[in-house]
Every structure is written in structure tokens, then in C-alpha cells.
Amino acid sequence: MRNKSRGFPNMNNNKFEGEPRAKDDFASKRPDGSTNTHPQERMRASGKR
């Protein structure tokens, strides 16, 4: 049986519902399917949000 169904408290305030953390602005692929360039800049920008 999973902890959620047993009623255990959420000790670390982990968020399992809602929006995913990854945003399209920082994705490695563009909407047209091509690869996004400059991965270091993209990852740095993702960490500064």
C-alpha cells in the first residue's frame, strides 16, 4: 500500500500534483523539433528562475 493512501504526512512538502517544473523556454528541443543551441546558457537560465 502506498504512503499516500495510508494517510502519512507529507514531510518534505513535496509537490506531486500541478504543473511540471520543466518549462518550454528551457527545453532542449524547439517546437519544430530542431535541437536548441547553446545548452550551457539554457541550463544557466533555467537555474536562475
UniProtKB/Swiss-Prot annotation:
Domain of life where this protein originates: Bacteria
GO process annotations (BP): asexual sporulation; sporulation resulting in formation of a cellular spore
Keywords: Sporulation
UniProt-annotated stretches for the region Disordered: 1-49
InterPro entries: SASP_SspK (IPR012611)
Biased composition (Basic and acidic residues): 16-32, 39-49
Induction of its expression: Expressed only in the forespore compartment of sporulating cells.
Localization: Spore core
GO cellular component terms listed in the entry, alphabetical order: endospore-forming forespore
Main location: other
HAMAP family membership: SspK
Entry's family note: Belongs to the SspK family.
Name of the featured protein: Small, acid-soluble spore protein K
Lineage: Bacteria, Bacillati, Bacillota, Bacilli, Bacillales
